[in-house]
From Swiss-Prot:
One of its GO terms (biological process) is actin filament organization. This is Rho GTPase-activating protein 25. It comes from Homo sapiens. The gene is ARHGAP25. Residues 355-444, 469-550 are annotated as: Disordered. Residues 541-644 form a coiled coil. The modification Phosphoserine is found at residues 362, 395, 536. Residues 159-353 form the Rho-GAP domain.
Length: 645
């Protein structure tokens, strides 16, 4: 018996993959949990935003009303507000959120789209989410929160402050973003005498046009006809749309404490505020200092513009200092303290923000930096722009990239040129500070790259383990034990072959021994190491073993970095959970205190009503007695005529 297959069968795997992807896109929340490990919502995490939106189905393209909850880095949607089991979720980091322009015929539809990251889309087969809000304001609010969680660059607005400042350094030295400078200069020129500046709103359509222009990379100039209130609204919008406010969330409670201390002891409050300002990131400090001086200039004309220090602090303070949890109760609780501390910063800006601190820090000299090997002018590589401020996470990332900036021959510049190093002119930090990335020579071969990468990785590993916050693992000890073996292999490699930039030029017959002897003498002068005899040569087997040892140690370093990163993430998650638990306990205490106050007021009201009832009862008893006496007298008066008759 023979089996005949249909002629129109298609064995193309792409079609099947597309079907699988489409089937995954319509999975429920329970099924999607198998593809994404964190699809189950954590009840301890406080929702960032929640509300009703309409979701477009992927196949039928009709709209469904769903209840969306933005929690941590996930967007969940439920069929009903009371449901505890989500119908689906979406992992937001790396996603793109964009507004969709509708036709004039579809007026009243405010649609935006969430496009997943390319890696997440390929792994999960998940389509984009097309959502519709009920109003323009609601859509803009959802887009703002989603972009903040997604962490995607969205132009100047919504971009991190340090990223904006670092990017704009190529246009010249700027302590604050260019947008802030432009707005402040325009307001100082045309808005000092404008009544209600920063209090009266600008034109929404013009603000949106200017925002889109800045996000598109343009630098629009404000002409004389530009409404000054529109420019002020644009400045407030930029400050409000920062992913993290100018005062970081970690220092929010510290600034509130300064505001509380102003009522009791203003001198102590000023000292505490100076401590908080000293630990601000440099970009945040520069922007806060610039804004406070700018607002001080505005309030000098308060007799005309009606904006005193207190009024400016009330209007601008909530944009500079805000809580991570945008709860109305939390905002109302912190508003008076924010207003007081902002007033102090504007009034005492000369003391709190001395102009001596405005000078940008010059990058440290290369010879004083033990973490980074200097790059010789004749070496192969790219000149990288240096960052002015190095945070804890930036220093860790710079450790991982230091291996790429070492000399491609596996040597330090002082080792390669020990005699002529003093004659070679060195560049000043200011010369290479603002240079763009440029390629100087051809790329080295793989062996040289591995050698240089290992030297950088070995030093970075020691720097990482010096930190007491991370506990070293057993693999770290193993890496320490291999250090001597690695140095021996490097000596063997350097003895056997000295890598030249021009690898395609054949060397002379007697050159290997001479180069090895020169290399050994240079290494002895610089490091004090005793190398093997220059006449000893190594075979191909030893070269391969040395390369394998380098590869294995490279893998070990990578594994250690991954382990440290996972430990760091785990500790950060624990810290976040503890902060959330602390906040929940604090919120519960506040709620209980409010309920206690309400009960006290109730009991006081009941006591008053009880007293009133007692007084009314006494009055009624008195009236009853009076009526009884009147009745008795009336009865007596009725009996007396009868007796007389």
């Amino acid at each position: 018996m023979s089996l005949k297959l249909p002629r129109n069968w298609d064995f193309n795997l792409k079609v099947e993959a597309a079907k699988i992807a489409r089937s995954r896109s319509v999975m429920t929340g329970e099924q999607m949990a198998a593809f994404h490990p964190s699809s189950t919502p954590n009840p301890l995490e406080r929702p960032i935003k929640m509300g009703w939106l309409k979701k477009q189905r992927s196949i039928v393209k009709n709209w469904q009303q769903r209840y969306f909850v933005l929690r941590a880095q996930q967007l969940y949607y439920y069929k009903d507000e009371e449901d505890t089991k989500p119908q689906g979720c979406m992992y937001l980091p790396g996603c793109t959120i964009k507004e969709i322009a509708t036709n004039p015929e579809e007026a009243g539809k405010f649609v935006f789209e969430i496009i997943p990251a390319s890696w997440d889309q390929n792994r999960m087969g998940q389509d984009s989410y097309v959502l519709m809000a009920s109003s323009q304001a609601e859509m803009e609010e959802w887009v703002k929160f989603l972009r903040r969680v997604a962490g995607t660059p969205c132009g100047v607005f919504g971009q991190r402050l340090d990223e904006t400042v670092a990017y704009e350094q190529k246009f010249g030295p700027h302590l604050v973003p260019i947008l802030v400078e432009k707005c402040a200069e325009f307001i100082l020129e045309h808005g000092r005498n404008e009544e209600g500046i920063f209090r009266l709103p600008g034109q929404d359509n013009l603000v949106k046009q200017l925002r889109d222009a800045f996000d598109a990379g343009e630098r629009p100039s404000f002409d004389r006809d530009t409404d000054v209130h529109t420019v002020a609204s644009l400045l407030k919008l930029y400050l409000r749309d920062l992913p993290e406010p100018v005062v970081p969330w970690s220092q929010y409670e510290g600034f509130l404490l300064c505001g509380q201390l102003t009522n009791a002891d203003e001198a102590k409050a000023q000292q505490e505020l100076m401590k908080q300002l000293s630990i601000l990131p440099r970009d945040n400090y520069s922007l806060l200092s610039y804004i406070c001086r700018f607002l001080h200039e505005i309030q000098l004309n308060c007799a005309v513009n009606k904006m005193s220090v207190d009024n400016l602090a009330t209007v601008i303070g909530v944009n500079l200092i805000r809580s991570k949890v945008e709860d109305p109760a939390v905002i109302m609780r912190g508003t008076p303290q924010i207003q007081r501390v902002m007033t102090m910063m504007i009034r005492d800006h000369e003391v709190l923000f001395p102009k001596s601190k405005d000078i940008p820090l010059s990058p440290p000299a290369q010879k004083n930096d033990p973490k980074k090997a200097p790059v010789a002018r004749s070496s192969v590589g790219w000149d990288a722009t240096e960052d002015l401020r190095i945070s804890r996470t930036d220093s860790f990332s710079s450790m991982t990239s230091d291996s790429d900036t070492t000399s491609p021959t596996g040597q330090q510049p002082s080792d390669a040129f020990p005699e002529d190093s003093s004659k070679v002119p060195r560049e000043k930090p200011g010369d290479w500070k603002m240079q763009s990335r440029k390629r100087t020579q051809t790329l080295p071969n793989r062996k040289c790259f591995l050698t240089s990468a290992f030297q950088g990785a070995n030093s970075s590993k020691m720097e990482i383990f010096k930190n007491e916050f991370w506990s070293p693992s057993s693999e770290a000890k193993a890496g320490e034990g291999h250090r001597r073996t690695m140095s021996q292999d490097l000596r063997q490699l350097s003895d056997s072959q000295r890598t030249s930039t021009y690898d395609n030029v054949p060397s002379l017959p007697g050159s290997p021994g001479e180069e090895a002897s020169a290399l050994s003498s240079q290494a002895c002068d610089s490091k004090g190491d005793t190398l093997a005899s220059p006449n000893s040569e190594t075979g191909p087997g030893k070269k391969n073993s040395g390369e394998e040892e380098i590869d294995s140690l490279q893998r070990m370093v990578q594994e250690l970095r991954k382990e440290i990163e996972t430990q760091k993430q785990m500790y950060e998650e624990q810290i976040k959970n503890l902060e959330k638990e602390n906040y929940d306990v604090w919120a519960k205490v506040v709620r209980l205190n409010e309920e206690l106050e309400k009960e006290k007021k109730k009991s006081a009201a009941l006591e008053i009503s009880l007293r009133n009832m007692e007084r009314s009862r006494e009055d009624v008893e008195k009236r009853n007695k009076a009526l009884e006496e009147e009745v008795k007298e009336f009865v007596k008066s009725m009996k007396e005529p009868k007796t007389e008759a």
